[in-house]
Amino acid sequence: FYVHGAVFAGWIGLLLVQTSLVAGGRTDLHRKVGALGALLAIAMLILGTVGALIAARRATGFVGVPVPPLQFLAVPLFDMVLFPAFVALALSYRRRPQYHKRLMLLATIVLTTAAIARWPGVLELGPPAFFGLTDLFVVALAIWDRRVLGRLHPVTLWGGAALIVSQPLRLVVSGTDAWLAFARWATGLLG
């Protein structure tokens, strides 16, 4: 799990480097570094998925989570669907900066839920706390759009809505027989 943490922290570092390169007018270098970012995103998808499956198989489940592990598995696995979807869309919109940067930001916001849930006291408050605090980043982006563009950018509207709608959907899906059967099957893939 240390590798997982280092790689995911690397994504945050990459985001800072990439935004600094663009702000400094070095879009040529930004594009080159972006290719490494795509590889990093693939590594994150693999590590995030495998890490979640391993945690769900442990007798203790997810550290500090008072929910049965197979049920809670929906939370990180939905992240591992949204994150690469936002990254793939961002890469497809490389030539449209307003779309690209918002999609990359949304991909990063997806990752913050796990980090926020680890803050002292947050996990004990349940999903409204860790999802709600994550959603504040989407709200900040929406406020930025309204102030700068005078309207919500379509990526902010639809991407933010997809992220926010996925949160209660995870909770509803996670308790179903179909989800639990899938979770048993998925964790069984590890051997």
Task: Pin down the residues of each PLM region.
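Alpha-helical membrane insertion/targeting regions
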Residues: 1-191
